[in-house]
Amino acid sequence: MSLAAKITVLGAGSYGTALAICLARNGHKTLLWGRDDNHVAAMEQDRENNKYLADCPFPENLALEADLEKAVQASDNLLVVVPSHAFADMLKQIKPMLTENAKIAWATKGLDPQTGDLLQNVARTVLGDRVSLAVLSGPTFAKEMASGLPTAISLSSEDDEFVAELSDLLHCEKRFRVYSNKDFIGVQLGGAVKNVIAIAAGIADGIGFGANARTALITRGLAEMTRLGLALNAEPATFMGMAGLGDLVLTCTDNQSRNRRFGLALGQGKEVEQAITDIGQVVEGYRNTKEVYMLAQRHDVEMPIVEQVYQVLYRGKDAKLAAADLLSRDKKFE
């Protein structure tokens, strides 16, 4: 049977749209699914996503679809780009719709909101062992990707053939470089932890602490990420790559990051709910903080930055007090 698309992207937010544009721009027939009929109709009419990614026109070979079953059955290659709290439900919905040779990748950054599990464990629980899985993660702002600015990303899977196929679909010598990484656990973990550290960096800047404090948070945040990774049998080198240090630096230092802007607002005195409302899109780090905190507690891993962000978001702790408590911790070797 001839399939309608080379790859289907599930999720028409800013990031899913940007990835769909990149895939289509590489010459592949790409289908982008969105859950809102009116939003999909507007994108079809405007040939761009004015709601989440304005001024980034769609290539001609990028098609739109609001019917989930049609979207899933249009291709063997599926790329899931939904918020982490919607990931399990999305997989449950599409499971009975999958083609015989379906393979699933995701660019969702986070953990399971109920258990703190890695998304690969969620996927295996829902889908079993038949479907090949892969994850994309790295320092990638949607607007820059969609605009064709140079970008690099990490891609990991336990299926080498799937990695090769996805890499070929995404890689573009002039603007999009894909690095393969065999550390499936580490690549997933980096994308979740960096969101929490970015909130901390934003809080510090919102308070007015300056570049020294921001750099210290990035450095110690990387140490926390690596400690948790080691407890989960990830490779330490992964956290010095695109999915670790790369994504961490990007998200902590640039205001395109919603997590950083969220932290800035908290540091400037806004309440959690108001800060999220003002941003107007999903702030993954809000949920990621609870998920990473749960995972660290389960594995008895010390993560003081994550713990203080958790106290601010979920226990009502004042951001300035949290910062003071971090600074007043006992002296220790690096």
Curated annotation (Swiss-Prot):
Sn-glycerol 3-phosphate binds at residues 109, 138, 140, 194, 247, 257-259. Keywords: Cytoplasm, Lipid biosynthesis, Lipid metabolism, NAD, NADP, Nucleotide-binding, Oxidoreductase, Phospholipid biosynthesis, Phospholipid metabolism. Pathway: Membrane lipid metabolism; glycerophospholipid metabolism. Belongs to the NAD-dependent glycerol-3-phosphate dehydrogenase family. NCBIfam families: PRK00094.1-1, PRK00094.1-2, PRK00094.1-4. The active site is at 194 (proton acceptor). It comes from Colwellia psychrerythraea (strain 34H / ATCC BAA-681) (Vibrio psychroerythus). The keyword Ribosomal protein does not apply. This is Glycerol-3-phosphate dehydrogenase [NAD(P)+]. It is found in: Cytoplasm. GO terms for cellular component: cytosol. Signal peptide: none annotated. It holds the Pfam family NAD_Gly3P_dh_C. Its EC number is 1.1.1.94. Its main location: cytoplasm. Catalyzes the reduction of the glycolytic intermediate dihydroxyacetone phosphate (DHAP) to sn-glycerol 3-phosphate (G3P), the key precursor for phospholipid synthesis.
